[in-house]
Structures are given as structure tokens and as C-alpha cells.
């Protein structure tokens, strides 16, 4: 009976650890990619909120948030800060500054790797704000099967 079982060749899934191999520049490559409708829809699925792009590099005083969006059915503002590196204190401050500057109801921080202390800070913010404000910390991973195109 074992002789009748066909052996199937399977590919290997691998993770691309250096996201800069895919998006060399965070602002001009990753943010531009994420702001495209099909990719913003992927983010919408991940957070459970329908997002519509308002603007990339939206001003907040002397600074600018990577993506300013809105929730489709409520018009609530959403700020999206990208960091294709491990989390750091600087970007945590940016997320809060941009959310305040745009009176956003949701703040989404997309990172390569979330350090435990920053994940706890986001959890603390969610625990100590009311239900009208929410913070998301998402890790982006890029995978490949053998020689296939990379997929987020």
C-alpha cells in the first residue's frame, strides 16, 4: 500500500528579515506601498476597521504622520506610523503626537519587531483611555515560498 502513495514536492516558507530588501526607504517606498488601496485594505482586515486614505505625510506642526486615514463608516480619523525597524521610544512618542495633532480616534503603529516594553506601553494606553480611542501595534512580516514573490 505504501508503494501507491505519491510523494509530493513541497516548497519552503522563509521570512525576509531585512524589510529594507523590499522597501529600501520607509517614506518613499513602504508608506507609498501601504497607501495603495489594495494594501490599505489588507491593513483594514488586520485591524477590523474599514480605512480610507486621506493623505500621506500629513502635517502635524513641524512633523508629519506617515498616513492619515479615516474610518469609512464613521469618518473617525486614523493615524498610521510606519517603522520598518524594531520599535523605539522615538516612534512611540510620534504615534501619540500624531494622534493628538489630528484628534485621531485610532493610532496604528506598524513595525518590523515589537519590543516587549513598547507592546506593554500600547496595552497600557488602551487600558487607560476610554473606548473612543484605540492604539494598535502591528508587526509586519514578509514571507516567500522558494523563489516566489515576497508576500506581506
Q: Positions of the model-derived regions?
A:
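Charged, terminal alpha-helix-loop-beta segments
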Residues: 1-152
Amino acid at each position: 500500500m505504501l508503494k501507491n502513495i505519491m510523494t509530493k514536492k513541497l516548497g519552503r516558507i522563509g521570512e525576509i528579515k531585512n524589510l529594507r530588501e523590499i522597501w529600501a526607504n520607509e517614506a518613499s517606498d513602504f508608506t507609498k506601498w501601504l497607501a495603495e488601496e489594495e494594501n490599505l485594505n489588507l491593513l483594514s482586515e488586520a485591524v477590523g476597521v474599514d480605512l480610507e486614505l486621506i493623505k500621506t505625510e500629513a502635517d502635524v506642526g513641524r512633523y508629519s504622520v506617515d498616513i492619515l486615514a479615516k474610518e469609512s463608516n464613521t469618518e473617525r480619523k486614523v493615524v498610521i506610523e510606519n517603522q520598518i525597524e524594531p520599535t523605539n521610544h522615538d516612534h512611540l512618542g510620534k504615534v501619540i503626537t500624531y494622534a493628538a495633532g489630528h484628534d485621531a480616534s485610532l493610532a496604528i503603529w506598524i513595525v518590523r519587531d515589537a519590543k516587549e516594553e513598547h507592546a506593554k506601553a500600547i496595552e497600557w494606553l488602551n487600558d487607560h483611555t476610554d473606548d473612543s480611542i484605540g492604539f494598535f501595534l502591528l508587526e509586519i512580516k514578509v514571507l516567500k515560498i522558494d523563489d516566489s514573490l515576497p508576500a506581506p
